[in-house]
Amino acid sequence: MLTLGNLSPQEGSTKQRKRLGRGPGSGHGKTAGRGHKGFKSRSGSGIKPGFEGGQMPLQRRLPKRGFTNIFKKEFSLVALSQLDKFEAGVVVSPAELVEAGMVKKGTLIKILANGEITKAVTVKVDKISSQAKAQIEAAGGTVVLTEVTAAE
């Protein structure tokens, strides 16, 4: 019987680790692949990422650009083709979209006109594109825009 205690990897699927500094017969003895003397042969050596030998590093030569807008609102995008999965006559609110796994809880929601919608649904969202609104209303549905706050 196969249990966690007797699991083993498939034959040939794993390599043995390279044992360095274990005598001349191994082919990796004495200097253990580090060459002779010098900074890089010592333990604890190695330059930091981004160090360019004293030359001004690239991340300091390039200028700083832009800023982060702390008032920016991030929207979760939902396509019309996703809304078509709901039954006709249903009120599609942020809670329903979270339950269906289309958006994460606590995000703002915007509907985009990707795909087609054939069912008449009432949509309650924070934002909607003009084409998406036109398609929903053409299918017999309605659009209710909520105040721009995060979904419960």
From Swiss-Prot:
InterPro entries per the UniProt record, alphabetical: Ribosomal_uL15, Ribosomal_uL15/eL18, Ribosomal_uL15/eL18_sf, Ribosomal_uL15_bac-type, Ribosomal_uL15_CS
Compositional bias annotation for Basic residues: 31-40
Gene Ontology biological-process entries: translation
Gene Ontology terms, MF aspect: rRNA binding; structural constituent of ribosome
GO CC field: cytosolic large ribosomal subunit
Bias type Polar residues, positions: 1-13
Region (Disordered): 1-62
This protein's UniProt keywords: Ribonucleoprotein, Ribosomal protein, RNA-binding, rRNA-binding
Family, similarity comment: Belongs to the universal ribosomal protein uL15 family.
Entry function: Binds to the 23S rRNA.
UniProt cross-references to NCBIfam families, sorted A to Z: rplO_bact
Oligomeric and partner information: Part of the 50S ribosomal subunit.
Cross-referenced PANTHER family: 50S RIBOSOMAL PROTEIN L15, LARGE RIBOSOMAL SUBUNIT PROTEIN UL15M
The name this protein goes by in its record: Large ribosomal subunit protein uL15
Organism this protein belongs to: Desulfotalea psychrophila (strain LSv54 / DSM 12343)
Record lineage: Bacteria, Pseudomonadati, Thermodesulfobacteriota, Desulfobulbia, Desulfobulbales
The gene coding this protein: rplO
